[in-house]
Amino acid sequence: MDYASVAMAAAPTTTTTTNVSLRRQRHRKEKLLVLMGATGTGKSRLSIDLAAHFPLEVINSDKMQVYKGLDITTNKISVPDRGGVPHHLLGEVDPARGELTPADFRSLAGKAVSEITGRRKLPVLVGGSNSFIHALLVDRFDSSGPGVFEEGSHSVVSSELRYDCCFLWVDVSVKVLTDYLAKRVDDMLELGMFDELAEFYSPEDEDHDEDSATRTGLRKAIGVPEFDRYFEKFRPGDVEGEDPGRDRVRRGAFEEAVRAIKENTCHLAKRQIGKILRLKGAGWDLRRLDATESFRAAMTSDSGEKCTEIWEKQVLEPSVKIVSRFLDE
């Protein structure tokens, strides 16, 4: 699927008015707020919190969440939790049309940035897929060679950006984040992730190899390869309505899949942090917000009030000040 041509064909034919509220003049770059961080660090929460202070719209930059389907497995923010804030490129791409590449994302997200700015709103890029973030933001993007984050790539991260960016990096200590991510997987299972994956499973698919590098699109999502191995042994249709942990063998296979999901999610978070540090080292002006204490409170306190209080003081309030200064520049 040529997503770039689709975006070009759908592009508006009229020139949008200057966004006075964002202090953007014709000769200046469009302003863009970028919320970065490893998976599970609260980027979506922060975007919704900031919407109470600024007129904004969200552009998703999570490469699994762009696809339709597997809403629980890919941890998409639910419609009620969006609080009426418009979201773009979230569950919009049909996975049957092929994999969305960084070049495709650059085209589609770039169009969204212009449209949001034209509505006198602040575009906010939210997601942990740093290859998509890099593709959208750099002034010159080469899609002909290996990506800047691909193994064996000698590409250099560019510090020349095509937008006037404000970067907020939501960070959580690895130990606390690891514990939280394990709990999040358990919560996702309670919400119905197992049933969602059972419905998604197709024995006719040829890419059941657990190595995500051999998979494409939505089939790369953490949870799919891990449970494919389970469903190969215990077909969903053969055990419909039964408890997946009914007997010892099945329970062992189920627990192994869950363990692998937790482990791979933590590995993903560590890789994402490494990429963020690489962007920072290349000169990207990332403002780090330490959310560790709010996450620790969420894991240890029975009341959400303490967690919310810490989050607002250590993450939200500093973010509001930073964004306010950014918009006044």
UniProtKB/Swiss-Prot annotation:
In the record, the note on similarity to other proteins reads: Belongs to the IPP transferase family.
Name of the molecule in the record: Adenylate isopentenyltransferase
Q: Is Endoplasmic reticulum included in the keywords of this UniProt record?
A: no
What Enzyme Commission number(s) apply to this enzyme? 2.5.1.112, 2.5.1.27
> Mutating residue 62 to A leads to what result?
Loss of activity
What is the tissue localization of expression for this protein? Expressed in roots, stems, leaves and cones.
Q: What GO molecular function annotation could you give as one example from this UniProt entry?
A: ATP binding
Q: Which cofactor does it need?
A: Mg(2+)
**Disulfide bond entries:** none
Q: How does activity depend on pH?
A: Optimum pH is 6.0-9.0.
Provide the function of this protein: Involved in cytokinin biosynthesis. Catalyzes the transfer of an isopentenyl group from dimethylallyl diphosphate (DMAPP) to ATP, ADP and AMP. GMP, IMP, CMP or UMP are not used as substrates.
Q: Which reaction does it catalyse?
A: dimethylallyl diphosphate + AMP = N(6)-(dimethylallyl)adenosine 5'-phosphate + diphosphate; dimethylallyl diphosphate + ADP = N(6)-(dimethylallyl)adenosine 5'-diphosphate + diphosphate; dimethylallyl diphosphate + ATP = N(6)-(dimethylallyl)adenosine 5'-triphosphate + diphosphate
Name the Pfam families on file.
IPPT (PF01715)
Q: Which GO terms describe its cellular component?
A: mitochondrion
